[in-house]
């Protein structure tokens, strides 16, 4: 997040601080290891995972603005099941890790963060976040309580945008057709904003929207909730 979309990370911090959370972002944290692991670099990815486990060992909660990364954290215990020490540490990390909107709604018990944004918005439900983490209602509740924002459901909302991490590289033609279909559905809503909760999906859809010159602003939900 700090490498590609720093504004999203900044928004996450500012929103949570307004909700009275004390934020710490350990300098030793790196990638969660998912791209390397999914590409077959198991040994290398485990080194990254161990570093992440250690970095967040003393945190009360770990919050991420990416359902994909959170799901990877949840997979750590299974990945380290042959190593009792690291499996135990991985299990502890997984238990306290939450997706950003999930944390706000289900842990902090807040559905209105006092955000304001004028316009019409639709929301893309990313695959890992909804299908694997089961985080479905939290982001919608938060968006519906943004003052001035009209929420419109996205047709075919349960369909993948075509990113899928390395899928978009390995299966470029198929990925391109999938994201084009998604952009078409976004246009059908007449939305001013396309909102999502996973950076990969937003980069994929945002790139296609930009190249086609569509008048639609792509935003991460953290940026929306940080609007005043």
UniProtKB/Swiss-Prot annotation:
GO molecular function terms listed in the Swiss-Prot or TrEMBL record: oxidoreductase activity
Highest taxon, organism lineage:
Bacteria
Q: Which GO terms describe its biological process?
A: lactate metabolic process
Name of one Pfam family that matches: CCG
UniProt xrefs under InterPro entries: Cys_rich_dom, LutA
Q: Name one GO cellular component term.
A: cytosol
Q: What does this protein do?
A: Is involved in L-lactate degradation and allows cells to grow with lactate as the sole carbon source.
Protein family (similarity comment): Belongs to the LutA/YkgE family.
The record's listing under PANTHER family reads: LACTATE UTILIZATION PROTEIN A, UNCHARACTERIZED PROTEIN YKGE
Protein's UniProt name: Lactate utilization protein A
- The record's gene field reads lutA
